[in-house]
């Protein structure tokens, strides 16, 4: 399967799925992971409502906050992929409001 095909299929199915609003908080302790994080965020860009990145130079880390409106599966998958990166921690908080896409 060509790269990006699975995400395309997932998004096609998502058109009639329920979506949730969520906030994903990411702590980056290893700057080498930044390129991979940005690539993943670009891949899921259609679900991103907004993004804020804060370099905390005093501690040598970066803090990223992502607001999403997406199917539960897409949010969980993105969170899992980011959480598996070396030197990266992620937590996600979900709204109880669910809507049809």
Language-model region placement:
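Long, contiguous binding/interaction regions
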Residues: 2-101
């Amino acid at each position: 399967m060509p790269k990006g095909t699975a995400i395309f299929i997932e998004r096609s199915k998502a058109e009639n799925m329920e979506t949730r609003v969520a906030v994903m908080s990411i702590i980056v302790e290893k700057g080498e992971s930044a390129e991979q994080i940005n690539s993943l965020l670009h891949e899921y860009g259609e679900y991103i409502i907004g993004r804020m990145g804060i370099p905390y130079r005093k501690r040598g880390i970066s803090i990223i906050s992502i607001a999403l409106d997406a199917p539960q599966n897409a949010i969980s998958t993105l969170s899992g992929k980011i959480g598996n990166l070396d030197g990266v921690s992620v937590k996600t908080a979900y709204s109880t409001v669910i809507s049809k896409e």
